[in-house]
Curated annotation (Swiss-Prot):
GO function terms (MF aspect): ATP binding; histidine-tRNA ligase activity
EC numbers for this chain: 6.1.1.21
Family membership: Belongs to the class-II aminoacyl-tRNA synthetase family.
HAMAP family listed in its UniProt record: His_tRNA_synth
Reaction(s) catalysed (UniProt annotation): tRNA(His) + L-histidine + ATP = L-histidyl-tRNA(His) + AMP + diphosphate + H(+)
Protein name (database record): Histidine--tRNA ligase
Quaternary structure and interacting proteins, as annotated: Homodimer.
PROSITE patterns, A to Z: AA_TRNA_LIGASE_II
Keywords from the UniProt entry: Aminoacyl-tRNA synthetase, ATP-binding, Cytoplasm, Ligase, Nucleotide-binding, Protein biosynthesis
Localization: Cytoplasm
PANTHER family named among the record's database cross-references: HISTIDINE--TRNA LIGASE, MITOCHONDRIAL-RELATED, HISTIDYL-TRNA SYNTHETASE
GO cellular component: cytoplasm
GO biological process, one term: histidyl-tRNA aminoacylation
Amino acid sequence: MKEQKLTTENYKGTRDFYPEDMRLRNYLFSVMKDVVRSYGYEEYDGPMVESLDLYRAKTGEEIVGKQIYNFIDKGDREVAIRPEMTPTVARMVAKKLRELPRPIRWFSIPNLWRYEQPGHGRLREHWQLNVDMFGVTSSRAELEILSLACDILFAFGAPKNSFKVTISHRSLLDEFLLDGLKVSPNQAHEVSKILDKKNKITQDEYVALVTKTIPNDSSAVSKIDLFLNATVNSLNQIPGIKEETLAAIKGLFEDIKTIGLSDIIHFDPSVVRGFDYYTGFIFEIFDTSPQNKRSLYGGGRYDNLIGLFSNEELTGIGFGLGDVTLQNFLTAHNLLPNFASDTTVFIPLLDDSSFAENHNFAKELRKEKISAEVSLVSQKMGKQLSYAEKKGYRWILLRGEDEIKTNTVTLKDMASRNQFTFSFSEALQKIKEELSK
């Protein structure tokens, strides 16, 4: 009976990263890290597996109930593969709360898991830049986070009109629903979930869900629509909104003018965000391209996460940017560069007697931080050149019979197809000069 072979397909909703894919991923990570480090943020990481209770506390019903990967470990503990990073960073900060200098500025790019239907911009495993600041209560923290979030896209070459930022405040919706519409806390919670998915359902479905949730108010839909269309200046006409909340929103938008982003940052009370831990300002960044018109990433202020672990509260604010949505954005706006191979110099082996000297040449190149691969098998020149071309090598460093006689090397530039005969030191200098351009 023929042995059944294992499938070569990867698990649904995940990706295999071949070398060319890793070049793209490393590029995305490198640009993001450069930007956040320029703001003074430090990198951290945490475990992929956490206690399930960590996510039950504040992550949100849909993720914990339907999307989380959880299991019972061999010690009979309920654990989960992390679906997000904010609960982990809050736990880590709380663990060393008295030792850490404030404000705390941290970032990480973890891989996260959610069991959901894969689609455009959505996979079961993805990597996400998480940026968090702890210990600053003033709206200057919002200004820094918003500026940083925009600077990441600018660093990839995104023009200002390629994305927009929408901002609201978590208290707005709560105050409107509880004090304006006079609904119960449970009804308010259900309405917020409906609004969070409003753009993903039809208008009829939206009306039906609101009517079912608030059956005793026939004008609930029109009142909610009035709220959703409010501007900063018309918010005082919405019932239930407190003066303190109004002042905070107006103050933030006055401050936004000072950082030169008022043309792309807009007020939008429909911004909800699905996590239960947000308590203050919340924001979403949207792609404006018709080919990729969707939310790219978002974040907000959370004031009660540290208190889950400690008697001391510490305010936090942050955002998360996924690699899949970022790549889709860069593709839609034609912002991805052509990635050349990391490989630089290939040294063919034409005769076994040359191997030791070729090996020594490669060592000298590597000392200069120039990657070099030495052929280990003596083969026909055409076959070795074909291999080097497929691998994307920039230069071929060749030592045939003529070069051995004259103690020289032939350096072939695979980009221009030009070749030169030098001493090895001259060839090394030529490569260094070209790499520095």
